[in-house]
Swiss-Prot record:
Gene expressing this chain: AGP1
GO cellular component: plasma membrane; side of membrane
Protein name in the entry: Classical arabinogalactan protein 1
Family designation: Belongs to the classical AGP family.
Residue stretches of biased makeup (Low complexity): 61-72
Provenance organism: Arabidopsis thaliana
Residue span(s) of the pro-peptide: 109-131
Membrane topology reported for the UniProt record: Lipid-anchor; GPI-anchor
Lipidation sites (GPI-anchor amidated glycine): 108
Length: 131
């Protein structure tokens, strides 16, 4: 009976420790050595130009324009036009470099500390119940 209680306690402790380790954040990648991958690959040169698709010289009667179809409706305002409420950013103002990118949130590290304290509390409670 004592062997089964201690086996349950060891299994419970291993489960809680592995749970806390699985929730821990991964270490930050090191910037030492290695090859940096460029964000946009260079375009490859084509040896022969692609043949242009053939276009028929005379339009079909079904595609002929009528006065109703030739009149264009008024165009809606552009969605990306700058307004007074939303200032537009120029492409040079947007940063692509990873050194200026935001880091990972620190909320996960705080919750992992609480998870480890909770694991210790549950293990102590299980130890008291086993004894």
């Amino acid at each position: 009976m004592a062997f089964s209680k201690s086996l349950v306690f060891v299994l419970l402790a291993a489960l809680l420790i592995s749970s806390a380790v699985a929730q821990s954040p991964a270490p930050a990648p090191s910037n030492v050595g290695g090859r940096r991958i460029s964000p946009a690959p260079s375009p490859k040169k084509m040896t022969a130009p692609a043949p242009a698709p053939e276009v028929s010289p005379s339009p079909s009667p079904a595609a002929a324009l009528t006065p109703e179809s030739s009149a264009s409706p008024p165009s809606p305002p552009l969605a990306d036009s700058p307004t007074a409420d939303s200032p537009a950013l120029s492409p040079s103002a947007i940063s692509d470099s990873p050194t200026e990118a935001p880091g990972p949130a620190q909320g996960g590290a705080v919750s992992n500390k609480f998870a480890s304290f909770g694991s210790v509390a549950v293990m102590l409670t299980a130890a008291v119940l086993v004894i």
